[in-house]
Amino acid sequence: MAKEDCIEMEGVVLEALPNTMFRVELENGHIVTAHISGKMRKNYIRILTGDKVVVEITPYDLTKGRIKFRSK
């Protein structure tokens, strides 16, 4: 699957789950479970409850995603 197929949406982190997973509420009201992308993990970027994030979602499974960016 190419990167162009992914859907990017903004959301807010609701809670932190084990194994660097997060529950994120998207701007359209849907709640997804997301994990941190590899570059964020490598650079030790911390994500806390209430942070605004950009989530990549595949069209195949709209309940899971990858946190790509954390805005201030």
Swiss-Prot record:
Keyword Nucleotide-binding among record annotations: no
InterPro entries (alphabetical): NA-bd_OB-fold, RNA-binding_domain_S1_IF1, S1_domain, TIF_IF1
Assigned keywords, A-Z: Cytoplasm, Initiation factor, Protein biosynthesis, RNA-binding, rRNA-binding
Domain S1-like: 1-72
Pfam families, sorted: eIF-1a
GO cellular component: cytosol
Subcellular location: Cytoplasm
Segments passing through the bilayer: none
Subunit structure: Component of the 30S ribosomal translation pre-initiation complex which assembles on the 30S ribosome in the order IF-2 and IF-3, IF-1 and N-formylmethionyl-tRNA(fMet); mRNA recruitment can occur at any time during PIC assembly.
Identification of the protein by name: Translation initiation factor IF-1
Organism annotation: Francisella tularensis subsp. novicida (strain U112)
